Amino acid sequence: MNSYDFMGLTKKECQDLCEQRNLIFRLISKDGDIYLPYPEDRRTDRVCVELEAGKVTKVVLQ
């Protein structure tokens, strides 16, 4: 799994890709507004994303 696979995708495209790969999707922020903080626990099946102008601009695989 590579974080670059998710970069530039829309929220829906990212969610669909996560579902295809059996990963947990977590939206951290959208256009600078924080929705959820980054989790403190570590997992191998979670994708945390930040969106700007409708596209994924930051991905943290946890």
Roles of regions detected by a PLM:
Residues 1-62:
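Exposed, flexible binding/inhibitory loops of compact, secreted disulfide-stabilized domains
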